[in-house]
Amino acid sequence: MNQKKKIMIVAGGSGGHVFPGLSVAHYLINHGYQVVWLGTADRIESKLVPQYGIDIKFIRINGWNGEKLHIKCIMPLFICLAIYQARKIIKYWKPDIVLGMGGYVSGPGGLAAWTCGVPLIIHEQNRIIGLTNRYLSIFSKKVLQGFPGTFPNAKMVGNPIRRAILAVPNPSRRWKGRVGPIRVLVIGGSQGAHILNKTIPNMAEKLSDKLIIWHQVGEQDFKKVIWAYQKIKQSYHRIVKFIDDIAQAYAWADILISRAGALTVSEVSIVGLPAIFVPFIHHKDRQQYWNAVPLVQAGAAKIIEQKNFTSDVVSAMLESWDRKTLCSMAQRARSIAAPNATQQVSQVIIEYLKK
């Protein structure tokens, strides 16, 4: 009977939306449900989702800030076209329920589901409500959230995390017998972050052999960052464009320096890894800052605003911590984790389908 039930996941744009959706998809498939995916052809989901054996179809939709007059004028037209495309796909696939996991595609996808009479469930990963989910919550049968207090009456489930990350050993096991320089993992999202790429090599020069760095640079700054490390004669650091096995990187690290996307914050909490967060400054609602606050309040992380993120500031912060302190911070991070988020999101869907 379950095999006849079909769930359409709508998510795209970044790993922060796609990876939680894939975690839920994997769980549902393992429990006998059919999963299909609605995304965009020019973003990460177009390559990632098919690797998991999931059928995916695409609509055309982009994000606009809407500041310019001509953008404001044509944006409704493009949104209506995207909704039309999504409706055609929904009528073709005939899903029993739609799960919106965020990204620009989720707006037209969610509205198309509602206008087609298909039940919609949405999940908000960030601590601050996104504009799309704010509107979609009006039409949704269930609203789920990754952080407490985002929506006033939503169900708190946490953010679904990949199984490989859930399997990372706890901090006490990882730190046992660990000696040598402090291991610093630097991640600025899949595209890298220019402020981290610019500042971290200068920090490395100041602290020299006190630490070893695994630095995900991204594509754009890669050659410049390689040159910066060569200039200071520190060739022992690991400099890469992208880290394929993030679970291995988390297990290796003593501390993370990164942006504060919702998924990164949730993964850090699950793994138990202290962090220095440098929130992205171009979100009007400062969502990354607020994502990081629970870990800061737990004593597991620090926030350095981008304007204050200098090699002197971050060097002083790292020098003030030893491995014993970092291990204690890691345990505090785990104390606020939501390790069962994938199961909780999936069970909400399954229970609704039983009605």
From Swiss-Prot:
Q: Which sites bind UDP-N-acetyl-alpha-D-glucosamine?
A: 14-16, 126, 162, 190, 243, 262-267, 288
GO cellular component labels:
plasma membrane
Cell compartments where the protein resides: Cell inner membrane
Q: Name the InterPro entries for this protein.
A: GlcNAc_MurG, Glyco_trans_28_C, GlycoTrans_28_N
Query: Where do the TM regions start and end?
Result: none
Annotated GO biological processes are:
carbohydrate metabolic process; cell division; cell wall organization; lipid glycosylation; peptidoglycan biosynthetic process; regulation of cell shape
Q: Which residues form the signal peptide?
A: none
Reactions performed catalytically: di-trans,octa-cis-undecaprenyl diphospho-N-acetyl-alpha-D-muramoyl-L-alanyl-D-glutamyl-meso-2,6-diaminopimeloyl-D-alanyl-D-alanine + UDP-N-acetyl-alpha-D-glucosamine = di-trans,octa-cis-undecaprenyl diphospho-[N-acetyl-alpha-D-glucosaminyl-(1->4)]-N-acetyl-alpha-D-muramoyl-L-alanyl-D-glutamyl-meso-2,6-diaminopimeloyl-D-alanyl-D-alanine + UDP + H(+)
- Its pathway? Cell wall biogenesis; peptidoglycan biosynthesis
Q: Which GO terms describe its molecular function?
A: UDP-N-acetyl-D-glucosamine:N-acetylmuramoyl-L-alanyl-D-glutamyl-meso-2,6-diaminopimelyl-D-alanyl-D-alanine-diphosphoundecaprenol 4-beta-N-acetylglucosaminlytransferase activity; undecaprenyldiphospho-muramoylpentapeptide beta-N-acetylglucosaminyltransferase activity
Task: Output the SUPFAM superfamilies linked to this UniProt entry.
Answer: UDP-Glycosyltransferase/glycogen phosphorylase
Keyword list (alphabetical) reads: Cell cycle, Cell division, Cell inner membrane, Cell membrane, Cell shape, Cell wall biogenesis/degradation, Glycosyltransferase, Membrane, Peptidoglycan synthesis, Transferase
Q: What is its EC number?
A: 2.4.1.227
Protein's membrane topology: Peripheral membrane protein
Q: What does this protein do?
A: Cell wall formation. Catalyzes the transfer of a GlcNAc subunit on undecaprenyl-pyrophosphoryl-MurNAc-pentapeptide (lipid intermediate I) to form undecaprenyl-pyrophosphoryl-MurNAc-(pentapeptide)GlcNAc (lipid intermediate II).
- Family in the record: Belongs to the glycosyltransferase 28 family. MurG subfamily.
Indicate what this protein is called per its UniProt record.
Answer: UDP-N-acetylglucosamine--N-acetylmuramyl-(pentapeptide) pyrophosphoryl-undecaprenol N-acetylglucosamine transferase
Give the source species: Blochmanniella pennsylvanica (strain BPEN)
